[in-house]
Amino acid sequence: MVINIQPDEIGSIIRKQIKGYVPEMKVVNIGTVLQVGDGIARIHGLDEVMAGELVEFEDGTVGIALNLESDNVGAVLMGDGLTIREGGSVRATGKIAQIPVSDSFLGRVVNALAQPIDGKGQIPASEFRLIESSAPGIISRRSVYEPLQTGLIAIDSMIPIGRGQRELIIGDRQTGKTAVATDTILNQKGQNVICVYVAIGQKASSVAQVVDTFRERGALEYTIVVSETANSPATLQYLAPYTGAALAEYFMYRKQHTLIIYDDLSKQAQAYRQMSLLLKRPPGREAYPGDVFYLHSRLLERAAKLSTQLGEGSMTALPIVETQAGDVSAYIPTNVISITDGQIFLSADLFNAGIRPAINVGISVSRVGSAAQIKAMKQVAGKLKLELAQFAELEAFAQFASDLDKTTQNQLARGQRLRELLKQSQSAPLAVEEQVATIYTGVNGYLDVLDVEQVKRFLVQLREYVATSKPSFGEIIRSTKVFTEQAEALLKEAIKESTELFLLQER
């Protein structure tokens, strides 16, 4: 069979194809690696790269362009960079660092790039958020007015925290800073608060322990853990808090309440110092770079209570900072104190004396939270701080005086019982009605008949007694948020009956 080829037809088909051809040109911004090491790469070329833009190396490692100099670009690596070689090519991606976000992140442990590290498979994501995004402006905010209960009597009564506040937790190592933060997360169960715990430069074993606590206590279902351990590259330790903030913002802008804990910002500052010094940026005080204040301020300003127009979502931040030998006047502590709305100061001396949580009530303050305290708490806790302050003065004086008058002795005895009342075991947060009952008992002298070592046992028994035999007391406090006369009468009855019962048992 002979095929008859028509040259005209073929010619017209070719002409048609040529007409329909769209020439495509892809312009890629390419550079060459000059030098690599210590998590830093110096790159020649990349002329049009932006500050903070992601760059991709031949082996797939991603970096962030931070130093844009006249003849080279300094990039920090998000990985070990062991397979990057001198002379290799680098491509500018045209993107700024962003992470996937969705509700599926709840209950998961992720790294600073929001990739899962808990071995439970990929996390489905619906959208992306920039890791660094600008904080809400003045018009987008409203003042803090709702309480965020931590479950710790000392904090909720005297250093209250409101939703949308930034409250610093500061103290030496091993003074229970993480315990205060994790107890606050445990206390959010059933409160419709999404929690984000960011672990920066911690031991992997410590992070695993915290995750286990959350899982055992049913707190992991409303919590996201972002972790970059001590062996992670400095770049990822520096990014982790911003990733946590981006995850919390996703929920905040969807009209939900969020709580974020940065544990701790001293390690983030150290990672940033390492990066800056390797990039040859000029060092400042304590060898930190000049913009270390901005590093923390732009992070903590993202915590806010949003306006009614934006749905009244909130993001409460509890940054943790470690001090050396109680020195609050070092560079990073003073910076973060000036950015936050108050601080909870944990003292090693109190911790070693068995007063836990080791909160130094004298120098801890909340500059916002008192506006967010419920009325019932304001009614009973007003006298508490004053009595404890007077007790601290008297105690110092009583060390030198031998014969004290009866009034002073009574005041000292009351102070010791109040201090006992503030002690709490770890992972045992108290509901607000239990706190109100506890403080009322102490401030009104109902503990004076007991020995100091009996106080803790009695209070546990009293709280159980109120919950079982006077359930309406808790209902009144929860529903009205006020310590009414009816509630007071119920509580007085419960204290009287419980004290009689307790003293009988002790005999």
From Swiss-Prot:
Keyword line: ATP synthesis, ATP-binding, CF(1), Chloroplast, Hydrogen ion transport, Ion transport, Membrane, Nucleotide-binding, Plastid, Thylakoid, Translocase, Transport
One of the Pfam families matching this protein, by short name: ATP-synt_ab_C
Localisation: Plastid, Chloroplast thylakoid membrane
UniProt cross-references to InterPro entries, sorted A to Z: ATP_synth_asu-like_sf, ATP_synth_asu_C, ATP_synth_asu_C_sf, ATP_synth_F1_a_nt-bd_dom, ATP_synth_F1_asu, ATPase_a/bsu_AS, ATPase_F1/V1/A1_a/bsu_N, ATPase_F1/V1/A1_a/bsu_N_sf
Disulfide bonds: none
Site (Required for activity): 364
One cellular component (GO) term of this entry: chloroplast thylakoid membrane
Positions bound to ATP: 170-177
Catalysed reactions listed for this entry: ATP + H2O + 4 H(+)(in) = ADP + phosphate + 5 H(+)(out)
Annotated membrane topology: Peripheral membrane protein
Quaternary structure and partners: F-type ATPases have 2 components, CF(1) - the catalytic core - and CF(0) - the membrane proton channel. CF(1) has five subunits: alpha(3), beta(3), gamma(1), delta(1), epsilon(1). CF(0) has four main subunits: a, b, b' and c.
The protein's role, per its UniProt record: Produces ATP from ADP in the presence of a proton gradient across the membrane. The alpha chain is a regulatory subunit.
PANTHER family reported in the protein's UniProt record: ATP SYNTHASE SUBUNIT ALPHA, MITOCHONDRIAL (PTHR48082:SF2)
Record protein name field: ATP synthase subunit alpha, chloroplastic
Organism, as annotated: Adiantum capillus-veneris (Maidenhair fern)
Gene: atpA
